[in-house]
């Protein structure tokens, strides 16, 4: 236990904090005169003032004190900034410890470099205002609020020497994801994982309102934290030296508490038995906009919502410009920097060195630590195939065997985890429980299964937390897979959107190394949620992902189990992408053997010769993307053989949806010649699609004669019904596809009225049978592939 702090040490801490605050204000306001070598003029001030001051002094306070803790105890600490709008504070800290200059040599540690540091902030073609990938030491931008604590816990998993300090703004604490994130402590194994120190910063206000947790009593807040399973430590005040003293002492106590928890767990007699500890949480209460202007134009600013962004605006008013000068001078920069603008040596000595610096922590640049997974060869798990449509299998159950051995092969390296919101078994991935369990540190009943403190499957009924854990795990250099019901992935589609923005920006930062891809398996999908109904039926994530940058977005729709295996192996090997795989879990007919699946998935799209009757030039192309659309297309082919056997039909299956785009638009896109080689230039195309039809039209709109594409897909008709009726009510069924052929092949026009009559008679028969028997007609339920190729 440290005997800190003495008066001299307190003054040094305060000086360092003042230096960070000075650099923070300078970034927000100044474009020149960085060291105040003369009185400020309007020319020294940026013409557009952008940035957030209110949270920044609190961030600088915490960061400064963590530096002291790291320095004293040689700790490995990762800093996660929940209120990411305090970006200038984190840039200031990286500049003070030297990391920023090491990575950006033009921003030197002198007056010229300081001026560049100031000018670039929130400046066109400079750097952004939040704690994005451009900020050394960051894994969390903190723009969209709610995810900081889940990211922090994801980073701590399997990192036993790491402490993740996560600052949570009191505004962010009101979000749903953050509220659920407090439960993450129940999944952290102190014997194997690192520690997370949540730091709840109560500065009282959001943009324009008081924050909830800052206004409740200390007794109520203490009860809340105890109820979540934390041991709360309070530090509060508005007098700097008193706060420095209290915070330093409290952090020493907290570190000793963390060390004690970990020692007890790591040297226990039975390492399999781990009692869930009461982890510490720091609750820090300081004024919003602390050390900034107390009053502006007669209105209180410091300690109020008015300090959230710019305490001083309209600097063309001389009193405001004078107040800015006084504000900057209050930090006494001449006591902090020498005449050349370099931080004084006695202050620079307060920072940790090398990788101990939080801004240089390699865990914040996870690609540096990333090791490839030891992947088994997926061909060893393929479904044996005597021929197309001869055997049935559950695609995700087959994948489960593969994932089991991915997990098994990674047990020693501890760099792979499986995540899901209480759905691993439901999604047929439960073979993984042959080699590991679900993480669980609390009480359990005698008939509970597959629960242990050593488990590597993360399940909590919160898609937000699963996604946040996985992102934190990936960003710190590991691998993972998130399986989720397709409809409920929308709960986190905004998180996925934010991760895409991070990846896009990180790829533009030269010193950032690529991380493992975000791999999402969507199952229990729209066409097989007939038992749960409309609320569980939504394929819309595909539309969202298709809007992302072409060098990030990947959408895969494997038609069967062997294709799913091929796609999954590819995704687990990949780097820097968001891979979404949509696959069913129900028993379905299988189409391609292992070798054919490998070739098909490598191409991403292809003509299925064994299903075609096109004699080189078809009269119609039947295309499909997704397992159920593939089934319905092949069933339509067999019906067409019965009713119009001489029609030349081509079947094209799409696994990689982005192959439909132009090669100039997407790296997986087909050239026009290859596209026309599959779809022709002028023949009608009937496209059965897993998702919303408009997405296909968007992807192919620049292709030859796009108006000839007629797309069937989900049209927002859902119910609790049978699997086939789901296709019927959305006009994706085989009988509708058959009618589409008659309507679009010119020489079949004389038979069109007869075809329509057959269609409506079949629909009436289907509905009556369904109502009477509650199941699909025998000709549907017992259908099998029987067509023989003439190709």
Curated annotation (Swiss-Prot):
Entry-linked InterPro entries: Phosphoketolase, THDP-binding, Transketo_C/PFOR_II, Xul5P/Fru6P_PKetolase, Xul5P/Fru6P_PKetolase_C, Xul5P/Fru6P_PKetolase_CS, Xul5P/Fru6P_PKetolase_N, Xul5P/Fru6P_PKetolase_ThDP_BS
Q: Which PROSITE patterns does the UniProt record give? A: PHOSPHOKETOLASE_1 (PS60002), PHOSPHOKETOLASE_2 (PS60003)
Alphabetical keyword list:
Lyase, Thiamine pyrophosphate
* Matching Pfam families: XFP, XFP_C, XFP_N
According to the UniProt entry, what is the EC number of this protein?
4.1.2.-
Gene Ontology biological process terms in this record = carbohydrate metabolic process
Kindly list the GO molecular function terms attached to this UniProt entry: aldehyde-lyase activity
Identify the cofactor(s): thiamine diphosphate
Q: Report the sequence similarity comment from the record.
A: Belongs to the XFP family.
Q: What is this protein called?
A: Probable phosphoketolase
> Lineage in the entry?
Bacteria, Pseudomonadati, Pseudomonadota, Gammaproteobacteria, Pseudomonadales
